[in-house]
């Protein structure tokens, strides 16, 4: 996670003008200077977009096709896509953003008018952009909790899952999640409950989405937590933490 030294240059490389393919976007990023050498700091970045494009190069398939064939179909996740056609677009909920005077503003109308239905279908980002359902994503998280297997279908080797859930950042500060946390391969990791002020057990992994979604895996409690909302930004509400606290308050043994 060593990208990117200049935020304006990073933004232009990612979005201005809108790239026509993953290859175009990543080639733009590759021309930028690093902010620091790998291992010196942790930074939230487009690192997994780079990984997603590497998957495309190695597999010879677009990322959407690769994920569908290797993960979504085997795990029976029929409602997880980068873009939706009209047959499923009607089920997509609207998205909101807080406005002035505590008013709620419609950000995306959902249904067939949503940008997830109408947008050009040429970018499949490893960093985000999937739409899904709680049931579908629960299957994925349960597979991780089960060390790579769900309903007799093995997606990952147990050692691979273990590697994903370990802290790979040492004592580097993770500014996005605060003290007492580290970062694995795609997940934040709770290292110290006291310092993190998290109700999750130490060793639990978690991450959230741009629209205030949150999910975590607590191996000590044999628990997967998942909450979906549709609001962005969400710094004015504590619903993600409140949901976690209430979940652990309900556990009596």
In which residue ranges do the predicted regions lie?
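Short, surface-exposed loop or secondary-structure junction motifs
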Residues: 1-202
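Short strand-connecting beta-turns/loops that link adjacent beta-strands
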Residues: 87, 220-221
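Short, well-ordered beta-strand micro-motif
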Residues: 188-189, 216-218
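Short, structured beta-strand/loop micro-motifs enriched in basic residues and often containing a Trp
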Residues: 206
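Generic C-terminus detector
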Residues: 232-253
């Amino acid at each position: 996670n060593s990208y990117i030294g200049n935020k304006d240059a990073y933004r232009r490389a990612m979005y201005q003008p809108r790239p026509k393919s993953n290859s175009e976007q990543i080639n733009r990023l590759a021309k930028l200077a690093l902010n620091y050498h790998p291992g010196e700091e942790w930074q939230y970045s487009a690192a997994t977009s780079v990984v997603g494009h590497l998957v495309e190069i190695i597999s010879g398939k677009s990322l959407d096709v690769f994920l569908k064939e290797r993960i979504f179909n085997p795990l029976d996740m029929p409602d997880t896509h980068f873009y939706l056609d009209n047959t499923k677009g009607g089920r997509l909920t609207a998205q909101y953003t807080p406005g002035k005077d505590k008013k709620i503003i419609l950000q995306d109308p959902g249904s067939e008018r949503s940008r997830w239905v109408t947008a050009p279908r040429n970018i499949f980002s490893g960093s985000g952009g999937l739409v899904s359902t709680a049931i579908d994503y629960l299957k994925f998280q349960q597979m991780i909790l089960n060390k790579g297997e769900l309903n007799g279908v093995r997606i990952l080797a147990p050692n691979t899952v273990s590697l994903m859930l370990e802290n790979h950042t040492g004592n580097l500060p993770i500014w996005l999640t605060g003290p007492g946390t580290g970062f694995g391969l795609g997940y934040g990791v709770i290292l110290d409950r006291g310092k993190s002020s998290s109700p999750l057990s130490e060793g639990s992994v978690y991450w959230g989405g741009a629209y205030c979604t949150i999910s975590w895996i607590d191996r000590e409690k044999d628990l997967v937590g998942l909450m979906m909302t549709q609001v962005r930004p969400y710094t004015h509400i504590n619903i993600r933490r409140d949901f976690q606290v209430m979940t652990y308050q309900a556990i009596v043994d």
